[in-house]
Amino acid sequence: MTDKTSLSYKDAGVDIDAGNALVDRIKGVVKKTRRPEVMGGLGGFGALCALPQKYREPVLVSGTDGVGTKLRLAMDLKRHDAIGIDLVAMCVNDLVVQGAEPLFFLDYYATGKLDVDTAASVINGIAEGCLQSGCALVGGETAEMPGMYHGEDYDVAGFCVGVVEKSEIIDGSRVAEGDVLIALGSSGPHSNGYSLVRKIIDVSGCDPQTTLLEGKPLADHLLEPTRIYVKSVLELIENVDVHAIAHLTGGGFWENIPRVLPENTQAVINESSWQWPAIFTWLQTAGNVSRHEMYRTFNCGVGMVIALSAPEADKALALLNEKGENAWKIGIIKASDSEQRVVIE
């Protein structure tokens, strides 16, 4: 036994020093996201967070998500700065549609070989997303797993917890015939449909870094971070009686809008109320994608759809546009027993 080489964890492909260096790199940006309810600092076995005292009957709302194969595109193009924003956005946008205020966020970062610069870039993006949504980044897990991922490839997952007053939960149960539907413009494909995006790029033979669309590289359009609607929507909820909110993610219009509709109602979308952003027109043309498939796969320029009573619509539009959103009336709710829950005409 004495003549054998002494092995270390680093020999097995796990660099603890690199992990410690990453923690030192991110401490500053993580601290900026802190909320007054958070107790303790980074590095504990668990993160502690008190409930905000303003809630009389608080209900916790939780969510988890990733960014799908947008991550593959980001890795191929070596652009990691916005992926963290995407990760937070996918989680907090899901929470706020139920009326919840995001409280804290945790991330999971897994890789075959830890590149401190890449990981720090991703986590800086996560911190930025948390700042945009008023959410505290309270911890995470960085897992270096040689043999599980190819080289420095990585994957990320996010976990978020928010809180809503029990009496103010938004669940779509009050959606009624005559309600107006308001759209919030998206920043691009957000974090959905990227397996099809990558297939279209492959089939078309274009280089996303040199192919120009509206004067900038296609890559810029495709890697534009997912818009975070939290602060705008929370202010809307405080001032307007909102009946339902749908976050248009995987499944697009056909699958996400029905998730907030009661039985015997139908969302009628006016397709002429907006123009698809150029990236969606390019994807449809380059991939010869059908209209139905576009609306099933992509948000086509609409990040959220909000249902509220008709008399509240103008007030809601004014507030949302004042907050910097691109908001417009996109449709109405009709009474219907049809199996087709969404009609786009």
UniProtKB/Swiss-Prot annotation:
GO molecular function ontology, one term from the record: ATP binding
Localization (cell): Cytoplasm
One Pfam family in the UniProt entry: AIRS_C
Cellular component terms per the entry's GO annotation: cytosol
Listed transmembrane segments: none
Documented EC number(s): 6.3.3.1
Class in the EC hierarchy, top level: ligase
GO BP terms in the entry: 'de novo' IMP biosynthetic process; adenine biosynthetic process; purine nucleotide biosynthetic process
Keywords: ATP-binding, Cytoplasm, Ligase, Nucleotide-binding, Purine biosynthesis
Catalytic activity reported: 2-formamido-N(1)-(5-O-phospho-beta-D-ribosyl)acetamidine + ATP = 5-amino-1-(5-phospho-beta-D-ribosyl)imidazole + ADP + phosphate + H(+)
Pathway(s) where this gene product acts: Purine metabolism; IMP biosynthesis via de novo pathway; 5-amino-1-(5-phospho-D-ribosyl)imidazole from N(2)-formyl-N(1)-(5-phospho-D-ribosyl)glycinamide: step 2/2
Record family assignment: Belongs to the AIR synthase family.
PANTHER family reported in the protein's UniProt record: TRIFUNCTIONAL PURINE BIOSYNTHETIC PROTEIN ADENOSINE-3 (PTHR10520:SF12), TRIFUNCTIONAL PURINE BIOSYNTHETIC PROTEIN ADENOSINE-3-RELATED (PTHR10520)
Name of the featured protein: Phosphoribosylformylglycinamidine cyclo-ligase
Source species: Salmonella typhimurium (strain LT2 / SGSC1412 / ATCC 700720)
